[in-house]
Amino acid sequence: MMDSTFDGMKSIDIFKEDCKFHHIGLSVKSIDALFPNMKPVTDPIQRVKVAFINLQGTTIELLEPLDETSPIYNNLKNNNKLCHICFEVSNIDNAINNGKKKGFHVIQKPVPAVALGNRKICFLFHSDYHIVELLQR
């Protein structure tokens, strides 16, 4: 049996603001093809269809592009399935500022997320961490 701890693991706190892991976002061509009985939510702001699944205790957000203008469309075109990792924060504006201090760049300012009860989300990019989504608690 493997030990669930790793020697030398470093704990980092980039965004502060009671930051907690929320989900992983994956690009898919068709949610219906994967899960025929699932009813995805259409988010016209993000230009995606969204559905959530639970994979052994981890929430996975499935993202299907609405059309070629969706940011997810290019992910699939380039065969990139992993879109982002999402963290829930108590104050999205403070978390953005903390991220900027650590080299993150805002690629989408806070907007309501239809699939998440219209809570604010934003996306940041870092060359080492890739794309991170922040979700207002």
Predicted regions: what they are:
Residues 1-42, 54-107, 118-119, 124-137:
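Glyoxalase I/VOC metalloenzyme domain signal
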Residues 45-49, 115-119:
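Short acidic/glycine-enriched loop/turn segments that link adjacent beta-strands
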